[in-house]
């Protein structure tokens, strides 16, 4: 039986501002990435998200991003490798404290937004992220863009297990990277098209790019976004589609 992880970015509310559909999406995913206060989230939201994840027996990961609340961590920043190391270590350490306080164990780290995209093509940034994980806890998994040489090499250097990630509702460029969110065709808004893409990646090992080319993808985890208008319905639809196609959903081991 084919096995795949379904992950989702949660814990993105901040103070009085609610974001996402955390409670409704949790039943349909096997792992979550919790915002750690830099691009979204706050201490109370972090604690509450961890507790809810444990109630659903969902694997917990840290989702560190750039310190950019207004831009939601989706804007590139001109920072040094040392700054990236500090940002990541600080954030994953904070989430780990909440997980331990709740009696749980953190499973992975997945960079957020611009930090993720920059790391996928910038070896220095990917190296800084992997180094922070190694110093924090080398048994933590690193979720990174499938086929990214920067992520692959950084994980190998620090002896960290890389979980290669693909995206359900994002389009891909010819080089295998994600189409920038600044482009009109960055998101797949048709649910059936998104599910078709996911099944191609999981069952057949490739994705169709915006240029009409096929790119090989070894997807071990699929990211769902939890903040769209139909995010919950989409998550449930993918969950049920996997079940119908005899695809087992579980967190990486």
Curated annotation (Swiss-Prot):
Reactions the enzyme catalyzes: 5-oxo-L-proline + ATP + 2 H2O = L-glutamate + ADP + phosphate + H(+)
Kindly state a single biological-process term from the GO annotations of this entry: carbohydrate metabolic process
* Protein name (Swiss-Prot/TrEMBL): 5-oxoprolinase subunit A
Q: Which family does it belong to?
A: Belongs to the LamB/PxpA family.
Q: Does the keyword Nucleotide-binding apply?
A: yes
Which InterPro entries does the record match to this protein?
A: Glyco_hydro/deAcase_b/a-brl, LamB/YcsF/PxpA-like
The record's EC number reads 3.5.2.9
What keywords appear on the UniProt entry? ATP-binding, Hydrolase, Nucleotide-binding
Free-text function comment from the UniProt entry: Catalyzes the cleavage of 5-oxoproline to form L-glutamate coupled to the hydrolysis of ATP to ADP and inorganic phosphate.
Keyword Transmembrane assigned to the entry: answer is no
| Single GO MF descriptor | 5-oxoprolinase (ATP-hydrolyzing) activity
What interactions and quaternary structure are annotated? Forms a complex composed of PxpA, PxpB and PxpC.
**SUPFAM superfamilies in the record:** Glycoside hydrolase/deacetylase
Q: Name one Pfam family in it.
A: LamB_YcsF
């Amino acid at each position: 039986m084919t096995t795949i992880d379904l992950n989702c970015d949660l814990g993105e509310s901040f103070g009085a501002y609610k974001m996402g559909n955390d409670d409704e999406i949790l039943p349909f995913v096997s792992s979550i990435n919790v915002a750690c206060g830099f691009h979204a989230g706050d201490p109370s939201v972090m604690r509450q998200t961890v507790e809810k994840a444990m109630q659903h027996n969902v694997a917990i990961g840290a989702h560190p991003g750039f310190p950019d609340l207004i831009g939601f961590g989706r804007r590139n920043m001109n920072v040094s490798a040392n700054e990236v190391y500090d940002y990541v270590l600080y954030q994953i350490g904070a989430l780990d404290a909440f997980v331990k306080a709740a009696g749980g164990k953190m499973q992975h780290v997945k960079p957020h937004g611009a930090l993720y995209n920059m790391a996928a093509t910038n070896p220095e940034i990917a190296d800084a992220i992997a180094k922070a994980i190694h110093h924090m806890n080398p048994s933590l998994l690193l979720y990174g863009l499938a086929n990214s040489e920067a992520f692959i090499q950084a994980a190998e250097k620090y002896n960290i297990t890389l979980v290669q990630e693909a995206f359900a509702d994002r389009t891909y460029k010819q080089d295998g990277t994600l189409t920038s969110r600044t482009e009109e065709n960055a998101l797949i808004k048709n649910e059936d098209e998104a599910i078709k893409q996911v099944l191609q990646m999981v069952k057949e090992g490739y994705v169709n790019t915006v240029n009409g080319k096929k790119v090989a993808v070894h997807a071990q985890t699929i990211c769902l976004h939890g903040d769209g208008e139909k995010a919950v319905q989409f998550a449930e639809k993918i969950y049920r589609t996997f079940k119908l196609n005899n695809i087992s959903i579980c967190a990486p081991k």
